[in-house]
Amino acid sequence: MLLGAFYDLGVPKKVIEQPLIDLGLKDLYQLDFKESKSCSIRGIKTKVENIDCSPIKRTWKSIKELILNGHLEDKLKTIIYGVFESLAIAEGKVHGIKSDDVHFHEIGAIDSLVDIIGVCAALNYLNPKRVYCNEPTLGKGFVQTEHGKLSVPAPAVIELVRQKNIKFLSDWNSIEGELSTPTGIALLANLVDYLEPPSKYSINSYGVGIGLSLIHI
């Protein structure tokens, strides 16, 4: 959703894909942005098709080497590294293993690599002075993962909000489902300056991203 919103805001597709090309990932996916509607509201839906036939599951160690050895500008490299490192530390903590040994089942998949790297590239391109975000709602219920059925918020989300001291909305009457993923919280932790809206602001432009899930309120 966030990547689609950035594209809708005007970030060129070339900007989003360039760091993926620089990291040697271009032949592993097909990225498309499509005008769509959800509840009659228009926006952009992002589709990442995985054409990576490799059975190898990436670890944080291999992703770290890919980022550090990649031909990226220093600022962007630091941002991308920070997001993945946060995820690795959190996943390592909840699974009781070293962060380097974490197998990224969900975020190691090529679609998640495209999503994380693309979002970081888009924000780097926009170069805002400050980034604001409302406190996240984590959700409730259960979610199906590579490790089986887990309660919501997922253990990695709990560890990330603890690790990064992220304040969140504790509404026990919140909508059923996973409203904040580990990837989303890691992006928030590394890209957002303030977890509250500014007291006064005006809107010059905005983007709308449409997700894959329909939440029933």
Residue ranges and their predicted role:
Residues 8-95, 154-157, 162-171, 175-185, ...:
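Glycine-rich nucleotide/cofactor/substrate-binding loop typically near the N-terminus or early
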Residues 99-106, 132-135, 170, 203-205:
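General beta-strand structural signal in soluble alpha/beta enzymes
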Residues 215-217:
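Conserved small/polar residues in nucleotide/adenosyl-binding loops
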